[in-house]
Amino acid sequence: MLELKWDGKDVALKTAEKIPLRLLDFDSSLSHGEKNSGNIIIQGDNLKAMKSLLPFYRGQVKCIYIDPPYNTGAAFEHYNDNFPHSDWLSMMYPRLEMLREFLSDDGAIFISIDDTEQAYLKIICDEIFGRDNFVANFFWRKRTAKSDVPHGISQDCEYILCYAKSESFHGSIKGKERKYFLTEDFPNRAWRYHDLTKQTTAAERPNSFFTIVNPKNGEEFPAQVNRTWAITMETFKSYYEQDRIIFPGDYDFLKISKPVLRYWKDDDIKKSGENFGMVAASTFLPADVGMSQNGTKEITEIFGEKKFSFPKPSSLIQHLIGIAVTTDKNSIVLDAFAGSGTTAHAVLNLNNVDGGSRKFILIEEQPYCNTITAERVRKIGGDFNFYRLGEKISDSEGKINPKVTFEQLAGFIWFSLTKSPYIQTEHSPLIGIHNGTAIYLLYNEILTRNILAMLPKHDGAKIIFGSACRIDDDFLKENKISFRQIPKELSL
């Protein structure tokens, strides 16, 4: 397989695994709306944030969209877009490796890029996701042509690379609704019709080169030499007996000049299942996804001023994530380069269109994470919990970092099991009950029978986090206790 080499790649290959697990500190003052919405915005380095999220969301994200720096050499106000080439590759590689771990087996990632690094990005994505999992390279027209450009050629398009986690991914979009008819002869069974010819020659399909005769009036419809029927004579007879052949004149509202084939709506639904009404997505994105100017206009309308350079229009991101999640209304969408928060906007828009309850996870390192990324979501009425990256959970010896308080560790554990923030009411080893299971934190204590006897009582299942356990497995099983050693098992 083709492999891309650059100075620093050996270090980049080991970067992700060396990132320590960190706390995620909940900030209620910057959160908005329902605390159990499942939507999350995290301020912090995206590689560190993803490492801390991975124990909770590994294999659960249906769609990832990222808009990383393009490495164009431009100096944008809000982010660095001027990496040396090898540094850009070393920045992207571990992040793509970690993003792959988030994807569900039927999930996909979409990556915006331009000509500067597109070819190199394709090669490293082939390495990370597998060449066989390359889905498509979408073309997005970002602007109309400019005249003042190098070499007299206006680069008006950008690209969106799409890779699947596995062959289980199937992308599609909502198509224009097919027109079905209810008629007097079939008042309870809707139908549509389709062309009965095929673009093949008589030499290619001799069995389909015949004359169809209308049994009701004897009118003849011969096949064309360069366009035969799509069926054989035997199939025609079978379809006619099933009321599937429609002739000119059968229905006054149908303006047809040759026989067509009837399809029943209930058969379409049965065949398509949850994909009924869906069509294949084209790599040529439709004009209604908008251009860069639409993204800028959107930001200006929300904030009353241009707060961000070159934001993508939410209609573009909505179209892309729709390819992956239109038929899954409860999926999770992740954006690790959140920027102005367009991905959250797109998820909320898609939910408004079809009544879905998809969740978003946004990660943004820059200070504007609150003032632009999160504020945009607040202004459009989205609910989310706001987190910041906190302390490392363990020290160099693998022990709990002494800077980590009981409350902080309790919050991390509670989030890991419930995906919701920990609201402390009192200092107790019983940090909460979730779905009938009591969750205990002993911090640096060892679980013994004496310690167990002192814990707040709970009749159901128990998960107990501690530094070690001195109770035998049979007793734990008999008392519905699952022990988890910290910090080791926090990342499992």
Predicted segments, located by residue:
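Conserved SAM-binding loop and adjacent beta-strand
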Residues: G304-S315
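Conserved beta-strand signature within the Rossmann-like core of class I S-adenosyl-L-methionine
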Residues: G107-I111
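Accessory, often C-terminal, charged low-complexity segments
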Residues: M1-R22, F26-G33, S37-N39, L47, ...
